[in-house]
């Protein structure tokens, strides 16, 4: 078993700082509209070209185990900021490096790291309050497009498509990003509720050319169990035939005699009917059937609630103005559910989203919520090559997350200016002198994103910072044009949530690193030289006799 190597105090923190610097230097080049690309080698296929901070951070593994620990801790900042706010990974990395670097100088000079940590925490708290006070809600589609454009590295097409998608499906709607088959980036919007189950038999098709089923003003029978016995279905089929309206049957499965009878009646023209399997599995299937029932004003036929198939009437069926079914999907548009019932169901799903700890469950609950309140928009990302496609798709996903964050908590002047505007509030904090050092660390660090944006644009960062400090409000440096002015008016805005999480996560990890006193890593095992092959192979000479086999 390999032994352990241990480093203490200054040596440990210096090794960590070397790792932090290596990672932060690679990530920081991507910051701002004039940020540069990073090319990442892949073990197969073409290299990845990216301007996304978290993608760069995830690729970095350092050979020195102590330096690597520092790099991994800052990588965690980037990942966490990306997961919670959807963007701001590069800002978070730049801040974490600056806070740790400044703090490490003070600790190396003999100051108390715990007091510095308390100062950093206090400064972070005050800065977050200041950011909340500066924040303005997104007023219109134009501002949403501006946030998307900035997060997609100044690509206006992406910003406009995201804003259009949000307008069409609402703030709660699901927006997914797919790879397009062409070079154009387009938006498809599905109104109503769509689930991934197609017709059970092609004989249900009403449009043979498009191979789709279209039902207008239709009843919907929602059944939890399998249907195989026709006898159970007959009463309700007779009632719908008398009413002269189409019928959609949703059930766990429909097979045997039941499916055959439905197909025969459809072909004869006795009954305009279609059947699909219920979406989802297990408990999620039950919940989705309840969602469909709420949306269409029907009842789920289930023994659990004492409703059986033979006893139901037309009043128990759901109803929708239009239903479209193809071989893969069913879309229900304009269900007849009561508004109050739908709102109650939405409230219930929102509460479940708040309570769940599983990312997978949260994603599925959000999909259900979107299907009830808005619809689904699909952004199809097009590009000339696969390399460009991957890079563009990552930018669209970033921009989408940032836009959602902006709608949630509002926006701030971008370009690192919002953080610089916190300096005034930080300078007024009254705490013990040693803790005050921690506040000064944060005050120096929050200038760093603006300095880096300016440096990446080929301008001296310190000059830009002084000019911005001498003004107030949303006055700042627009790196895209090289001009100074009102950044909010120029459309250079950042989501409040993104800036807040970047600062909080950076302060958190930098504090942990500053208060580190020992680091433990495995000693690299010495490679044993390979043994020479034994001399017993000489006996193979006897194989010469094999010649007689020829």
Swiss-Prot record:
Cell location: Cytoplasm
Molecular function GO labels: ATP binding; ATP-dependent protein folding chaperone; isomerase activity; unfolded protein binding
Top-level division of the source organism's lineage: Bacteria
Enzyme class, first EC level, given as a word: isomerase
Swiss-Prot/TrEMBL catalytic activity: ATP + H2O + a folded polypeptide = ADP + phosphate + an unfolded polypeptide
InterPro entries, alphabetized: Chaperonin_Cpn60_CS, Cpn60/GroEL, Cpn60/GroEL/TCP-1, GroEL-like_apical_dom_sf, GROEL-like_equatorial_sf, TCP-1-like_intermed_sf
Family: Belongs to the chaperonin (HSP60) family.
HAMAP family for the chain: CH60
Protein name: Chaperonin GroEL
Pfam families noted in UniProt: Cpn60_TCP1
Chief location category: cytoplasm
BP GO annotations: protein refolding
Subunit structure: Forms a cylinder of 14 subunits composed of two heptameric rings stacked back-to-back. Interacts with the co-chaperonin GroES.
Record's function text: Together with its co-chaperonin GroES, plays an essential role in assisting protein folding. The GroEL-GroES system forms a nano-cage that allows encapsulation of the non-native substrate proteins and provides a physical environment optimized to promote and accelerate protein folding.
Native organism: Desulfosudis oleivorans (strain DSM 6200 / JCM 39069 / Hxd3)
NCBIfam families: GroEL, PRK00013.1, PRK12849.1, PRK12850.1, PRK12851.1
Record's GO cellular component terms: cytoplasm
EC number(s) on file: 5.6.1.7
